[in-house]
């Protein structure tokens, strides 16, 4: 089965061979080939992917604390039948009902005082489950395709992502694999999502345009894409997307964006409302996170209680730290690449676009809070800390990811008009 990308149509090798060998139906070699099937998997990853190497005990944090590490079925079976000297501890420190490692003080039961893994030390690397072996490598699965990224929740991965100066590119290769079938996988929608994401990545990486307009284009495109799907008019989206591409970032587009803002809603008030809408609904994975979030936002909003002082701080921050615009771009690209095409499973296209913008703006607000304290450019380590801590609270919890998406999809505060206000500067 050969995957023809972009259209996502599947053809068997017998159909291809039938075309190639037309007129040679009596050829025994040809008849043999026609009975064979070849399946290929397409694997995509960002250009910085291979730069990652675990820094072990030099890491400022551990990847084995603050979240419940789920165990895949194959590893669980391996642990159940393990006969070595490590067997008793292995069996005692696994929650067999939940298929997860037990935690003590929010730390994995196998994490020792040196922040190293006792399972790795005592039983070897072959005993690690899929999650522990792959992390921070994150995999999104689609039929005939895997998309790999480095999770922002890892300090070293966050450092790599933030340090990219050039626009990120994505590399793809194929490998022969076993056949797989996903029930009810919508290839037409997936093809439209892939094509649209390609276009939106180009939009987000257009450095001739201020980031705020790039975010606005992302939002209006995903909004219109969602409308087409809701109306069951997916066939019309290609034409609509072409109009978005043609309009670019013209003065007419910028004027239209300004006209979609709510005139009675200041950015600072809107951001406060968004924090209040989301934070109470999310589970807290690290006790330190609540303290950090409260202290940082108090620094920001007490220093700048009104729109005028807030905007002055934001403009001062942008002047002092111009390279943030590139890092902001890298974050937008990270969120969009990782989650957008997952809309093939739930059709929440606009919510995925909102997620890229809101998560990036959340991180920006926290960085701005740090800036409000010192009025000097944040250190690279401070930026990394904000990014990976935010990511851990969100991406290490399926419950939090699902809750955020539901809020983005349903709450009025996340309407297009409100979000255009956030793109006004």
Residue ranges with predicted function:
Residues 115, 123-224:
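Internal, well-ordered alpha/beta segment that forms a basic, Gly-enriched binding/recognition surface
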Residues 48-96:
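Polybasic, low-complexity association/targeting segments
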Residues 209-425:
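Hydrophobic, aromatic-lined core segments that form the binding pocket/scaffold
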Residues 41-59, 91-129, 146:
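Immediate flanking context of iron-sulfur cluster ligation sites
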Residues 5-8, 29-32, 39:
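Low-complexity, intrinsically disordered or signal/transmembrane-proximal segments
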